[in-house]
């Protein structure tokens, strides 16, 4: 089963997450099919901390991918931000 979830990167005490489409059996930071965005929870003020390719997320969910709870929250937040800016 395909899932869209967070894969951790960055260094110790400086987390950085990639939003990836991957098989649910793969490891958290293992092999993935496509990177659909990123999330930086400790980004400096005024820098971009979240970017998601909403079109690709819709494509994968249309093909049966599930969103993890954290990714679902981030997608909701980002789509509200994008629609408010438009």
Swiss-Prot record:
Record's signal peptide: none
InterPro entries on file: Ribosomal_bS16, Ribosomal_bS16_dom_sf
One GO term describing the cellular component: cytoplasm
Keyword Nucleus: no
Protein name: Small ribosomal subunit protein bS16
Domain of life: Bacteria
SUPFAM superfamilies: Ribosomal protein S16
Gene: rpsP
GO molecular function: structural constituent of ribosome
Family affiliation: Belongs to the bacterial ribosomal protein bS16 family.
UniProt keyword annotations, A-Z: Ribonucleoprotein, Ribosomal protein
Transmembrane segments: none
GO biological process, one term: translation
